Amino acid sequence: MPENSNIPFSSVFLEKNPPIDAHIDEILQWCKKLYGFSSNPVMEGNLSFRTGMGFIITGSSLMLNNVTKDTVVEVRGVVFGLNRPSIYTKGQTAPSEEALLHSVIYEAFPEINAIFFLTSHNIIEAAEKSGIPSIDTNRPAGSQELAREVANLFKSNNNTGPLIIKNRGVIALGKTISEAAQLTEEIQKKLESGVRVKSGKK
């Protein structure tokens, strides 16, 4: 598969077979659920969880409802070169362009085992109204610089609750997949509640 030129790193495929892990089914279930939540589907995003070799993340340029066992990738290492980083993977496709963000967070927070990053104007709006901390940055999407800024903000907030990356999305961390999912669901429910109020529904 040709590599997306917009991805800010090079993918080095150690193995072309898709990764195998018991938690993949759980991630796929959440991809479908978050995409189809009420009347406000989250169209895109990237979900990951830590493994013994690194972490498994959804593939590049995928709608959440299109993620399958063949389009998740295990990131096993990152090497920062002179031009751009190289990410060493097991799988059939390149990892999400935010793979560096996930990698830096996992390195900074050993207790974190799952990351949900959802991109949708509606979910950002709902998160902002909820008073969730935010970061407004001009750093390129998927860059090492952005990843470090986000990790630093999580550190300053004692790694509690989700975080908004303005004009991009909402990121939630969890010690488990369920914990990251629960934080995301809470924002989605607030979004749904807001829609009902605006439309006059109860």
Enumerate the predicted regions with their spans.
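Glycine-rich flexible loops
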Residues: M1-K202
